Regions:
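Sec-dependent N-terminal signal peptides
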Residues: 4-12
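Low-complexity, Ser/Thr/Pro/Gly-rich disordered linker/stalk regions
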Residues: 19-177, 182-302
Length: 302
């Protein structure tokens, strides 16, 4: 009888902590019609010791399934030439194949941060990012900050800036649609970046959208925490809280009409914007300060 009970406990425990296979995640994304956004693998720096880093969820806005990411305290990993653990980082991300620059690309994401999401600001939290290679440097990030969802033309490649896309009051507990269009072109007279949030134009940038060394780039998304010591210092703790996000309807195409229907494309392309809400990031701000958001003209983005 005792052996039988132990066996049952083992089976239940094994099922509870079984890791989701990459093939299951890819299948769920494919069912939503991912277009050219074909995932390659789990990021190699996702911790193999993580409890439930990436899983398929029945909570969805597109189709029947979404992808759930979870990051817990201490879930970091290393490779021969780099260690997230030794560099103040934790991550759980999906990784995509390298693609060439100077190509017009349209991306769509639906993200959901729970109402009770544990913000780690002022530490950095990247939800979506593109990196160029040789050298490996960030181009663009969609981040979660004290100001909410922000668009970051990253300081690795451009003049660092944070445009507020959606405040926390509207972001948390609601699905958010992100549509991002760029051509990853390094020339200032040819490059562009546009961002629509829930169908509303938030960024319309004309200028360099890459560097001369960015011939190849790749997408990764999920939860990428960095500079965690800032959170620990500000809140006097050594433990990072659990972080959870859902992604759904992830898709990439070469034109708007392939990404979404033509009527919606016309509505998106007919919009214009004259000013942005710029977030002035403070490394050790405990909360959003009144003077941390400034309205500036759209040509202020460099």
């Amino acid at each position: 009888m005792r052996i039988f009970i132990i066996l049952i406990f083992f089976l239940i425990s094994s099922n509870t902590f079984a890791k989701t296979k990459f093939s299951e995640v890819r299948k769920a994304l494919k069912e939503d019609g991912y277009g050219k956004a074909i995932p390659e693998k789990f990021h190699h720096l996702n911790s193999p010791k993580a409890i439930n880093p990436v899983s398929v969820s029945n909570f969805s806005i597109i189709g029947n399934k979404s992808i759930r990411f979870e990051s817990n305290n201490g879930e970091c990993w290393q490779e021969p030439k780099w260690s997230d653990c030794e560099n103040d980082r934790e991550r759980t991300e999906l990784y995509y194949k390298k693609k060439p620059w100077k190509k017009n690309r349209w991306y769509r994401f639906y993200i959901y941060l729970p109402k009770d999401y544990n913000s780690i600001a002022p530490a950095k939290m990247s939800l979506i990012q593109w990196k160029r290679h040789k050298p490996s440097k960030v181009l663009v990030m969609f981040q979660h900050t004290h100001a909410g969802l922000t668009f970051n033309r990253n300081g690795d490649s451009f003049k660092d800036s944070h445009v507020v896309l959606k405040p926390n009051e509207e972001l948390l507990g609601n699905w958010t649609e992100i549509i991002f269009n760029t051509n990853w072109h390094p020339k200032s007279d040819k490059g562009h970046m546009k961002v629509w949030i829930d169908g509303n134009l938030k960024v319309d940038f004309k200028g360099a959208s890459n560097t001369k060394k960015g011939k190849e780039l790749s997408l990764r998304y999920g939860l990428y925490s960095s500079f965690m010591s800032r959170f620990k210092t500000v809140f006097d703790t050594q433990t990072m809280p659990q972080r959870v996000i859902f992604f759904d309807g992830v898709k990439e195409e070469t034109s708007c009409e392939k990404l979404i229907d033509s009527d919606k494309c016309q509505k998106l392309m007919s919009q214009s914007i004259n000013e942005y809400d710029f977030y002035l990031y403070g490394k050790y701000d405990k909360k959003l300060k009144i003077n941390s958001i400034m309205k500036l003209s759209s040509n202020s983005l460099k």
